[in-house]
Amino acid sequence: MGKNVVVLGTQWGDEGKGKIVDLLTERAKYVVRYQGGHNAGHTLVINGEKTVLHLIPSGILRENVTSIIGNGVVLSPAALMKEMKGLEDRGFPVRERLFISEACPLILEYHVALDVAREKARGAKAIGTTGRGIGPAYEDKVARRGLRVGDLFNKETFAAKLKEVMEYHNFQLVNYYKAEAVDYDKVLADVMAIADILTGMVVDVSELLDGARQRGDLIMFEGAQGTLLDIDHGTYPYVTSSNTTAGGVATGSGIGPRYVDYVLGIVKAYSTRVGAGPFPTELFDETGEFLCKQGNEFGATTGRRRRTGWLDAVAVRRAVQINSLSGFCMTKLDVLDGLKEVKLCVAYRMPDGSEVTTTPLAAEGWEGIEPIYETLPGWSETTFGVKTLDGLPQAARDYIKRVEEVTGVPVDIISTGPDRSETMILRDPFDA
């Protein structure tokens, strides 16, 4: 039987998942997105050419791979069409390779308007959303008033449902947020113009994946954002609106939970975060600036500067627990090149002076936390593009080994550059 592998982030997103998914799809037959929306930003560099994907799975660039958007994804028709056009203009036959669950909730213009209005109303307490309507779309889904891809099969019913839900949301926009109403006729016309394209890509995803599993095809599940942004297990309320953890694979795709064989956690060699929220190891000094500059830490989706800091092994251990991680892929090791010393957070000192090795559950619990560091020697040699473990400086190997020791999880893959070729696979997830 074929192996089913999950690839997800262990931190606050931006760990480098896209490149690793693209690399591993050389063997996969299917790549599945199971949560999030076009708030994700997965950057791939292949033969020097850069591709940024927000909604379509990273496997779309491979000709023998089927890409699937599962029911756990909130789908913006406008964003999908834009992304499809960009890929098709470059010669990728997206409509032959991409399929969509009819249960995907739709993100429409009023969701974006609500997202923006709410962030503005929060003022200094803004969460730092991407402003793309993700949260309001998930809210509609849970409230059972959301429109889904499958609703487009009956255009008259869709129009009636849209009118009802827009009356509700426009009332909020105008009377509570003092914002402009969203035009119903425009929203309807925009969706109807591409409805047939969307419905033409619909499949029964659960049935498709179960058949693939029984045939022994290799399936990869591509996570978006990161564990610490999970709606339930993240730094609430500074989180995204979906389950970014491994548990979201089954609910967001329709595959049974027993059929996940290996969970690969992507861990950046240091920490970054976009937007507001707790970040115990954040650096505000020259080292923080160094990490930002060397790592080109600007969001692929928003362009915002990412906050930077040392690797937080306490937070990563939480990701190990929640996701039952099988192994790590460490990315951006080369960004640490040239530092005289490298620090690793192994515990927290609480405001009362006590030391803990677990993370708080709510954002308030993080207040006043001080990181407790181990300091390791840095290295002056370059690790960029190194393709063998023996080719790494001894200090870099010692750092990797220490991360393995404090987390209890092996580093199975090491990324030393943005190109898919700049990677060493010590243990292939599909063979583990």
UniProtKB/Swiss-Prot annotation:
One term under GO cellular component: cytoplasm
Ligand binding (Mg(2+)): 14, 41
Cofactor(s) demanded: Mg(2+)
Group of enzyme by EC: ligase
UniProt keyword annotation of Nucleotide-binding present: yes
Subcellular location: Cytoplasm
EC number: 6.3.4.4
Reaction equations catalysed: IMP + L-aspartate + GTP = N(6)-(1,2-dicarboxyethyl)-AMP + GDP + phosphate + 2 H(+)
Domain of life, source organism: Bacteria
PROSITE patterns: ADENYLOSUCCIN_SYN_1, ADENYLOSUCCIN_SYN_2
Pathway the protein takes part in: Purine metabolism; AMP biosynthesis via de novo pathway; AMP from IMP: step 1/2
ATP-binding keyword on record: no
Function: Plays an important role in the de novo pathway of purine nucleotide biosynthesis. Catalyzes the first committed step in the biosynthesis of AMP from IMP.
Protein's name in the database: Adenylosuccinate synthetase
